[in-house]
C-alpha cells in the first residue's frame, strides 16, 4: 500500500509572503488535496538575525487570507536544532561524515588556488580520511558530509525530468557548523524526513540544493521524496519578478483590493494549465491539478490579466460577500478609514444597495471603494474636472426643469424615475444622455458612476433633490 501524500510549505520568516511563495504554497496545497493527503507548514527560522515573529505572523496571515490551510501546528526549524545535531553525529559515527578542522586561512588558500587554476572553489577533502587524533587543540570542528567522488547524483524530478550532477562538482559540504548549528542543506533533509514528507514542490532555484540533499538522504539510508522543481515567476519583460515589476507581497495585493479567490485562480495558471480553462473553482483546481502538468518554462506575471480576472470574480460575487470583503480591507487602503467611519446603519444599507451597480465598473476593491465615495460625500459636492464641464450653463439649464419632474415622482424606484425622466426627455425633444450626464455630475460630482437611476435610489429622494438643488441654484 502506498504512503499517503504529504507535502510541505517551508517559508523563511525574513519578510512578507511574496507572490512566488504564495504560488508554491498553492501548488503544495492543491496537490495534497488532489491526492487526499496533507500539507504541512514549517517555518525555516534558523537565521536568527533576520527571522522575526512579525514576518512569521504575516506569512500565516497571508496563507489564511488566500484560503490555504495547513494540517497540524506550524513547525519551527530552529527548535529542532538538537535533532539536526543528532543526525549529523550519527552520520559521523557511521563513517558517512567527518569532523573538519580546516582553518579559515586554509579555506581561503583553497579558494585562491582554485581561482588561479580557473576552477570553481571546492573544499579539497583534507580532513576526509585523517585520523581525528591529529585534530589541533582548542579548535571546534565543523561536520562535513562524505560526498561521493565518482559518478553522478541524479535528481528524479517530476517537472524537470532526471537532472544529473557530476559528483566531482559536489564537494564535501558542511552539514553542522562549528557552533553546533545546522546548515540549511542539512536541516531541511532531517525535517522533511521526520515530518514524513513524500513530495517536495518548490522553486527551481533549489535544484542544485536537491542534489546535495539527495546525498544526505542516501547517506542516512532514507527514502528521497518525489521532487518537483517549478519554474520561477518572471515579469512581463521576461526578467525575474522583482520590486520594479510592481507589488510582490500577498499583503500588497490584499491592500490593492484583490479577492483571494481571484488571486488563487490567477496564480494556479502561472506555470500550470488545464486545457483552455481560464476561470476555475477551487474544487475544479483540486480535481484537475497534477505536478506532471506543470510547465518547465518560466511563467510571466501579467498585472492586467490579474485585474481582469479579479473584475470577473467581483462581478460574479454575491453582493453581501463583496460588501463584507470591502469592509474588511478598508483599514488597509488609502481613504478607507474615512469610508469605514461613514458606515453607520444607513450608510451600510446604502452601500449594499449600490453594490450591483458599483461592482460592474470596478476591477478591484479599491476601485469599488472609490466608486462608492459619492454616497458619503458632503454637500455641496466637490466636482471633478469632467463633472464641472458637464455642469456648465447649458448643463444647468437642462437640469433645472428636471428638479420638479423628480420632485413629483410618487414611488422613488429606479423604474418610476426612469419612466419620469424618459417622458420629460421626450417632451423636451432631448436624448436621454443629454439629461443623464449633467444629472449624474450633480448627484456624484463625477462623470462616471453606476446607472443614474440606481444612484437616485441609493441616495434617496431628499439627498438627491438637495444635490441637484445645489447645482441649479
Curated annotation (Swiss-Prot):
Keywords: Aminoacyl-tRNA synthetase, ATP-binding, Cytoplasm, Ligase, Nucleotide-binding, Protein biosynthesis. Its EC number is 6.1.1.17. It is found in: Cytoplasm. Belongs to the class-I aminoacyl-tRNA synthetase family. Glutamate--tRNA ligase type 1 subfamily. GO terms for molecular function: ATP binding; glutamate-tRNA ligase activity; tRNA binding; zinc ion binding. Its main location: cytoplasm. Catalyzes the attachment of glutamate to tRNA(Glu) in a two-step reaction: glutamate is first activated by ATP to form Glu-AMP and then transferred to the acceptor end of tRNA(Glu). This is Glutamate--tRNA ligase 2. ATP binds at residue 243. GO terms for cellular component: cytosol. GO terms for biological process: glutamyl-tRNA aminoacylation. It comes from the Bacteria. It catalyses: tRNA(Glu) + L-glutamate + ATP = L-glutamyl-tRNA(Glu) + AMP + diphosphate. NCBIfam families: gltX_bact (TIGR00464). A motif ('HIGH' region) lies at residues 11-21. Gene3D superfamilies: 1.10.10.350, HUPs (3.40.50.620). Residues 113-133 have a biased composition (Basic and acidic residues). Monomer. Residues 113-136 are annotated as: Disordered. InterPro entries: aa-tRNA-synth_I_cd-bd, aa-tRNA-synth_I_codon-bd_sub2, aa-tRNA-synth_I_CS, aa_tRNA-synth_I_cd-bd_sf, Glu-tRNA-ligase_bac/mito, Glu/Gln-tRNA-synth, Glu/Gln-tRNA-synth_Ib_cat-dom, GluQ/Sye. PROSITE patterns: AA_TRNA_LIGASE_I. HAMAP family: Glu_tRNA_synth_type1. A motif ('KMSKS' region) lies at residues 240-244. SUPFAM superfamilies: An anticodon-binding domain of class I aminoacyl-tRNA synthetases (SSF48163), Nucleotidylyl transferase (SSF52374).
Amino acid at each position: 500500500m502506498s504512503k499517503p501524500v504529504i507535502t510541505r510549505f517551508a517559508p523563511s520568516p525574513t519578510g512578507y509572503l511574496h507572490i512566488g511563495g504564495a504560488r508554491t504554497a498553492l501548488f503544495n496545497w492543491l496537490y495534497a488535496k488532489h491526492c487526499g493527503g496533507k500539507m504541512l507548514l514549517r517555518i525555516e527560522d534558523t537565521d536568527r538575525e533576520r527571522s522575526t515573529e512579525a514576518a512569521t505572523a504575516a506569512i500565516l496571515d497571508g496563507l489564511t487570507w488566500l484560503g490555504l490551510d495547513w494540517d497540524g501546528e506550524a513547525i519551527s526549524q530552529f527548535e529542532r536544532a538538537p535533532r539536526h545535531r543528532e543526525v549529523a553525529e550519527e552520520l559521523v559515527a557511521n563513517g558517512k561524515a567527518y569532523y573538519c578542522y580546516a582553518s579559515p586561512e586554509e579555506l581561503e588558500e583553497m579558494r585562491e588556488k582554485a581561482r588561479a587554476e580557473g576552477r570553481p572553489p571546492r573544499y579539497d577533502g583534507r580532513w576526509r580520511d585523517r585520523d581525528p587524533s591529529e585534530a589541533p587543540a582548542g579548535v571546534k570542528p565543523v561536520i562535513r558530509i562524505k560526498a561521493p567522488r565518482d559518478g553522478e547524483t541524479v535528481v528524479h524530478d517530476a517537472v524537470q525530468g532526471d537532472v544529473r550532477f557530476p559528483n566531482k562538482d559536489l564537494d564535501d559540504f558542511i552539514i553542522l557548523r562549528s557552533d553546533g548549528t545546522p546548515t540549511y542543506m542539512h536541516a531541511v533533509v532531517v525535517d522533511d524526513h521526520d515530518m514524513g514528507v513524500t513530495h517536495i514542490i518548490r522553486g527551481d532555484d533549489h535544484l542544485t540544493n536537491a542534489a546535495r540533499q539527495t546525498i544526505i538522504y542516501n547517506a542516512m539510508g532514507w527514502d528521497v521524496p518525489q521532487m518537483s522543481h517549478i519554474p520561477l515567476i518572471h515579469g512581463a519583460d521576461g526578467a525575474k519578478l522583482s520590486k520594479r515589476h510592481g507589488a510582490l507581497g500577498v499583503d500588497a495585493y490584499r491592500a490593492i483590493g484583490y479577492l483571494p479567490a481571484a488571486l488563487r485562480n490567477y496564480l494556479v495558471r502561472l506555470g500550470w494549465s488545464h486545457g483552455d480553462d481560464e476561470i476555475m473553482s477551487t474544487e475544479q483546481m483540486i480535481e484537475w491539478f497534477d505536478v506532471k502538468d506543470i510547465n518547465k518554462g518560466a511563467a510571466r506575471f501579467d498585472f492586467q490579466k490579474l485585474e481582469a480576472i479579479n473584475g470577473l470574480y467581483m462581478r460574479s460575487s454575491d453582493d453581501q460577500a463583496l460588501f463584507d470583503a470591502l469592509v474588511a480591507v478598508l483599514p488597509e487602503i488609502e481613504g478607507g478609514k474615512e469610508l469605514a467611519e461613514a458606515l453607520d446603519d444607513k450608510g451600510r444599507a446604502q452601500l449594499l444597495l449600490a453594490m450591483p451597480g458599483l461592482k460592474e465598473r470596478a476591477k478591484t476593491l479599491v476601485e469599488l471603494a472609490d466608486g462608492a465615495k459619492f454616497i458619503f460625500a458632503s454637500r455641496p459636492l466637490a466636482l471633478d474636472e469632467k463633472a464641472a464641464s458637464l455642469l456648465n450653463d447649458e448643463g444647468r439649464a437642462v437640469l433645472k426643469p428636471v428638479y420638479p419632474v423628480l420632485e413629483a415622482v410618487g414611488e422613488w424606484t429606479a423604474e418610476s424615475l426612469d419612466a419620469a425622466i424618459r417622458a420629460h426627455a421626450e417632451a423636451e425633444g432631448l436624448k436621454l444622455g443629454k439629461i443623464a450626464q449633467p444629472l449624474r455630475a450633480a448627484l456624484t460630482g463625477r462623470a462616471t458612476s453606476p446607472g443614474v437611476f440606481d444612484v437616485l435610489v441609493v441616495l434617496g429622494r431628499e439627498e438627491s433633490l438637495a444635490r441637484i438643488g445645489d447645482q441649479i441654484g
